[in-house]
């Protein structure tokens, strides 16, 4: 079940009883203002996460977009599935090529980004990866710019993405495109019994 509350009394009611009955906690994932009280409360019950990932939430409004020349960045196709899977280190069956935007240099996939969510108003970017041999060359910025331009042209008004706190190079490139840091997000993963 999902708990979104900053009210500690309500949190205790919603979490303590299910935990006492043996409910296994797998993950707490939410904006930090909701997730942190839950994670801290679970720690008081001696349920500690294996790992915590804190991310900044970056938001881009269409009117703030500072697009750049994207070179040959393009949407993915079925023919690209294997190279997308290789760069993303995922199984090919998990790749949805039409949600991917790709940048190739000399027939090598050097950067990619994809859509994690889409509504009439918003798009959420994820899976931004630049090949380790091609980092700090602007390829990630180009592929994200192409993706943003595509969805703004489709009528969406805002883009959203999550960036780990320690990924300073990515934060800089998103800010150059017009993204603003607007919130914090926390994911806490727990061991399965």
Specify the residue positions occupied by each region the protein language model found.
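Acyl-donor-binding surface of acyltransferase catalytic domains
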Residues: 2-70, 188
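Conserved acetyl-CoA-binding loop-helix of GNAT-fold acetyltransferases
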Residues: 8-17, 130-132, 136-153, 171-176
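Conserved GNAT acetyl-CoA-binding A-motif
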Residues: 22-32, 151-163
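Conserved beta-strand-loop-alpha-helix junction that forms the acyl-donor binding cleft
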Residues: 29-35, 161-171, 187-193
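A short beta-loop-alpha structural element at the N-terminal edge
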Residues: 31, 72-84
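Conserved active-site tyrosine of GNAT-family acetyltransferases
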Residues: 38, 42, 174, 179
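Helix-loop element at the rim of GNAT/NAT acetyltransferase active sites that forms part
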Residues: 86-92
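A conserved beta-strand-loop-helix scaffold within acyl/acetyltransferase catalytic domains
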Residues: 92-129
């Amino acid at each position: 079940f999902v708990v979104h509350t900053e009210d500690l009394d309500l949190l205790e009611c919603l979490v303590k009883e299910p935990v006492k009955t043996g409910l296994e906690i797998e993950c707490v994932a939410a904006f930090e203002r909701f997730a942190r009280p839950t994670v801290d409360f679970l720690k008081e019950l001696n349920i500690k996460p294996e790992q915590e990932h804190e991310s900044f939430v970056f938001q881009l409004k269409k009117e703030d977009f500072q697009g750049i020349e994207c070179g040959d960045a393009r949407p993915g196709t079925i023919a690209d599935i294997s190279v997308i899977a290789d760069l993303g280190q995922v199984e090919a069956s998990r790749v949805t090529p039409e949600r991917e935007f790709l940048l190739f240099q000399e027939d090598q996939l050097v950067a990619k980004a994809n859509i994690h969510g889409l509504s009439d108003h918003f798009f959420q970017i994820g899976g931004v990866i630049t090949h380790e041999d091609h980092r700090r060359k602007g390829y990630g910025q180009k592929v994200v710019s192409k993706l943003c331009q595509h969805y703004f042209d489709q009528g969406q008004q805002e883009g959203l993405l999550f960036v780990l706190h320690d990924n300073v190079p990515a934060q800089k490139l998103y800010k150059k495109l017009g993204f603003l840091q607007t919130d914090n997000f926390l994911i806490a993963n727990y061991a399965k019994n």
